[in-house]
Amino acid sequence: MTQWEVVIGLETHAQLSTVSKIFSGAPTQFGAEPNTQACPVDLALPGVLPVLNRGAVERAIRFGLAIGSTIAPRSIFARKNYFYPDLPKGYQISQYEIPVVQGGQITIQVPANEKAGKPAYEKTVNLTRAHLEEDAGKSLHEDFAGMTGIDLNRAGTPLLEIVTEPEMRSAAEAVAYAKALHALVVWLGICDGNMQEGSFRCDANVSVRPVGQEKFGTRAEIKNLNSFRFLEEAINYEVRRQIELIEDGGEVVQETRLYDPDKRETRSMRSKEDAHDYRYFPDPDLMPLVIGQDWIERVQAGMPELPAAIQQRFVDQYGVSAYDAGVLTSSKAMAAYFEAVVAKAGAANAKIAANWLMGDVSSQLNRDGIEIDAIPVSAAQLALVLQRIADGTISNKIAKEIFATIWDEKATDEGAADRIIDAKGLKQISDTGALEAIIDEVLAANAKSVEEFRAGKEKAFNALIGQAMKATKGKANPQQVNELLKKKLG
């Protein structure tokens, strides 16, 4: 049986977070009434000329610096010619032969797949280019009986199209790359990353070939995937479709396909064009884009500390694992919150802080559907909870209860943990005499478990610990209970 290799390349459109459009002064606000944010340039009225938005260029430079690419000292804009109702000029202003960002790399963390028995691993994805272009308008098919409405609010919105080499070999790798790219553009402040509003969307080029074959198979492009789940589902379906088609004696056709999330399948949209079909030529209305070293240095000076550098610093400074550091730097807000907690709780509590952020904190955020920057528990409040675990005042179980109380109360006092501990009498029982008395009662009431433990059943010991913790309503120091039980059971 033929073994197949999957080949995936992604083209990602990141909408740049400028106040105005790339070639006009019209606003870029999302959700306005149709055609209220389109000026004569966007409408392609006769006699108007495009003027390049400097802010869009600076955001492209920032991205290029972050991925270690070459910033072209001279790049040009081209007209990409095609007809579509929401493209009033009859062409899109883009970059073709000389893009502003050339090359670069993004390192991704691919999670383990326990079902397939595959461990987690790291991979570097090479980028071909990233170029500036304008977005098209939007066709509206609802509310127009038998007709299509055109909304040109989006026309002219600045995009950075980011293109990878065809180096990804599974949907899992493609999703890991898309998530890493999404986190990076949001981190850099060049894109808000709102996938529901179309600020970040992917086109996936998918093909298959027999393992060991160098020649690429015929690719299909799946357009406008605006969620990581859809990206994964669409690629997996397309891979199955192509393999089944070839094994049944058919041929894969080069085409553009759309993903139907309701049916969880891709369907043909149109035949896929090649570059020559668009008849690219330099836009005569725009001067070449010249970027001097002084401009690059000014942008570099304003760059934030990058996720990769912070990850390494977290590993070196706080002793967290590389994987944990990756999770903690999944967003700038998460990294800042972690460092704020550690600053209050002390570096000695960095690992427990990391575990809490990836565990209880993330769980509560998901439950409430909010991001870390909207968390109702301040870094100082969480730090105090962790300090009380460290100094033995409370157990980890009680700490979870206190954290949940602070969260639900939306408490504002920095000393909320101590207040709740005192009000509810939650201090951990660490007095040896008191614990011994409780353990004696537990042993007397659970003679069967004692016999089973002495007969070699380790599970019985855990049952006794559970009974002791139950007797103290979770307030006993678990480590002391463990030691005292072992001592008494000989």
Swiss-Prot record:
GO molecular function: asparaginyl-tRNA synthase (glutamine-hydrolyzing) activity; ATP binding; glutaminyl-tRNA synthase (glutamine-hydrolyzing) activity
E.C. number(s) listed in UniProt: 6.3.5.-
EC primary class: ligase
Keywords: ATP-binding, Ligase, Nucleotide-binding, Protein biosynthesis
Domain of life: Bacteria
Example of a GO biological process term: translation
Record-linked Pfam families: GatB_N (PF02934), GatB_Yqey (PF02637)
Catalytic activity field: L-glutamyl-tRNA(Gln) + L-glutamine + ATP + H2O = L-glutaminyl-tRNA(Gln) + L-glutamate + ADP + phosphate + H(+); L-aspartyl-tRNA(Asn) + L-glutamine + ATP + H2O = L-asparaginyl-tRNA(Asn) + L-glutamate + ADP + phosphate + 2 H(+)
SUPFAM superfamilies, per the entry: GatB/YqeY motif, Glutamine synthetase/guanido kinase
SMART domains: GatB_Yqey
Record PANTHER family: GLUTAMYL-TRNA GLN AMIDOTRANSFERASE SUBUNIT B MITOCHONDRIAL AND PROKARYOTIC PET112-RELATED, GLUTAMYL-TRNA(GLN) AMIDOTRANSFERASE SUBUNIT B, MITOCHONDRIAL
Subunit-level organization: Heterotrimer of A, B and C subunits.
Described purpose of this protein according to its UniProt entry: Allows the formation of correctly charged Asn-tRNA(Asn) or Gln-tRNA(Gln) through the transamidation of misacylated Asp-tRNA(Asn) or Glu-tRNA(Gln) in organisms which lack either or both of asparaginyl-tRNA or glutaminyl-tRNA synthetases. The reaction takes place in the presence of glutamine and ATP through an activated phospho-Asp-tRNA(Asn) or phospho-Glu-tRNA(Gln).
Recorded family membership: Belongs to the GatB/GatE family. GatB subfamily.
Name of the protein in its database record: Aspartyl/glutamyl-tRNA(Asn/Gln) amidotransferase subunit B
Originating species: Burkholderia vietnamiensis (strain G4 / LMG 22486) (Burkholderia cepacia (strain R1808))
Gene: gatB
